[in-house]
Amino acid sequence: MPILRAAIMMDQTPNPGPENKISLMIIGAQKAGTTSMKNYLGQHPSLQVHPHKELSYFFDPLEYEKGFDTALRKYYDHPSASTQLIAKNAGLYVSESGIIRLKEHNPGCKLVIILRNPVERTYSSYLMEKNYGAINGTFESIEPVLRKGDTSDWRYEFFIGMSLYQTHLAMIYKHFPKEQLRIIRYEDFKARSAELCTELFEWLNVDASFKTDTATKYNVTHINRSPSYGRLVVQLLRNQNPVKKLVRKLMPGKMDYKVGEMLRNINKTNKLYGEIPESMSKLLREYYAPHNEKLSELTGIDFSDWNKPLTK
C-alpha cells in the first residue's frame, strides 16, 4: 500500500475548518507541477479552485491586510457550503510569515507539497526567469552565485534556496503537525497523477470514485519569442503597477487575470529548451547531496536517487 494512501486511511476525519476557509493548500514547490495538481483537483464537483495560477493572499502582506472576504471575491466564483476550497501558491513553502497567516486562517488546513529533484528544479526555475527577462546569462553563469552562497542575492534564493527543501519543511513543521502535510515526489506525480488525486480526494472526504483527467500538462516552460516583450509583460502584471490597477478597475471579475495570461501566451513558441548542461548537473548534484540526505532523515522518504546523474 503506498505511503500516502496508508496515511490517509488512518486519518479520515473531516476537515475542521469553518465554511469558506481553505481546506487544502498546495504550498510548493515552485516548478514542480503544482499548477497541474491544482487544476486536476479542481475537476472534482465537490472542490473549487481559483483560475489564477497562484493565490497570493497569504504570501502578499498588502493583500492579506484587505481580509479574506476580499480575497474570496477575487479568486473564487460563488463559493458555497457544499464545496471545499482548494488553493495553490507554489512559493508559500519558503515564506514563514505566509505559513503563519495560513494557520491563523485555518489551523486544520491540509497541506500538499510536491518535491522535485533540486537539480531539475533549479534549471527549470532559471528557464522561467530567463523567459521573464530577469536573467540574460547562460545557466553556467549561476555557478559563481552557487559558490558564493550569498542569500541576499535573489538568484541564489530563487535558483538554490528554493531547492533546499529540508530547511523549509523544518520551518513548516513548527506551525503545522506532520499529519497535515502530504509530501509527494515529483517523479510519482508524473507517473501516477490520477491515483494521487484519488488519494487526496479520500483525504478530503469527498467522492474518491471520481475519475480525474490528467492528460493536460500545465505551465510547461517554452522558449519565448522576445525577451524584451517578456520583461514588459512582467512589469505590467506587477500588483503595484498603475496600469494593472487601472485594468482591474475597468474589467469585471477575473478578466484582468485572463488578459495577463493572454499577454504571456502571445510570446510563447512551441519550442522547448534543451537539457541541462552536464557540467552544471554534476556541480549541482554534488552541492545538493548532503541536503538531500538531511531531507531523507527529516521526512523518512528516500531521496538518494536524486544524487545520481539525470536520465534523459
Features from the language model and the residues they span:
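A short acidic, amphipathic alpha-helical/loop segment
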Residues: 97-101
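PAPS-dependent sulfotransferase catalytic core
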Residues: 1-93, 104-105, 109, 118-151, ...
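Short catalytic/ligand-binding loop motif for oxyanion handling, primarily in non-cytosolic enzymes
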Residues: 35, 93-96, 119-124, 190-195, ...
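A structural signal for short, well-ordered beta-strand segments and their strand-loop junctions
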Residues: 49, 85, 110-114, 180-185, ...
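Surface-exposed cleft-lining segments at the edges of enzyme active sites
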Residues: 89-90, 148-160, 275-280
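The conserved 3'-phosphoadenosine-5'-phosphosulfate
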Residues: 171-282, 286, 300-301, 306-312
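Generic structural signal for small/hydrophobic residues in well-ordered secondary structure
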Residues: 33-34, 86, 102, 111, ...
